[in-house]
Amino acid sequence: GCESACCKNLWQHGKKEKISSIGIIDPKQRKSWMIDATPDFPQQYRKLTVEHDTELAGIFLTHAHIGHYTGLIHLGREVMGEKNVPVFVMENMEEFLKSNGPWDQLIRLKNIQLNRIKKNVNIKIGDSLFIEPFLVPHRDEYSETVGYQVTGQNNSLLYIPDIDLSLIHISEPT
């Protein structure tokens, strides 16, 4: 297996952390949303829907790297057999999913329903709950990369899954 420090620690100590994903819960509507569908999707889905007694109302994807979208496969006919789960994606991510298997099968069989979103455009997901995608500098081999700002009635949070700091130019004050 992998010999990097983080993998060696896992193999030696056996503690496996979950891959980063955010759950958004609207307790009034009893609905939830996920940001990213990771390889740990089954546990993350269960935590949102069973432990918090909500219905999954949608999944917002950040980009086309393995830890951020591959959990979608669990929605297909070989596992959950879901129907029309809303998946919110930017333009290049949409094309990636439509053009590559097994993701295109999820679309054809209507396990997922793609909803194209645009950068810097707020999306209302609850009475006073909004989510807004914004572009993030990262390796964009297959799709653009976005972060999300989630805004509620009293608080907001910023989720940036991956970022390449070397691609950010910081100007010196003049």
Residue ranges and their predicted role:
Residues 83, 107-113, 127:
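A short helix-to-beta-strand connector/capping loop
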Residues 62, 161, 174:
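Ser/Thr-centric signal marking residues that sit
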Residues 1-48, 114-167:
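Core dinuclear metal-dependent hydrolase active-site scaffold
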Residues 92-102:
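A short, active-site helix/loop in glycosyltransferases that binds the activated sugar's phosphate group
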Residues 54, 67, 110, 127-129:
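Structured loop/turn residues at beta-strand edges in well-structured enzyme cores
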Residues 30-34, 38-88:
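Active-site metal-binding motif and surrounding structural segment of the metallo-beta-lactamase
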Residues 63-68, 138-140, 169:
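Histidine-centered active-site/metal-ligand motif
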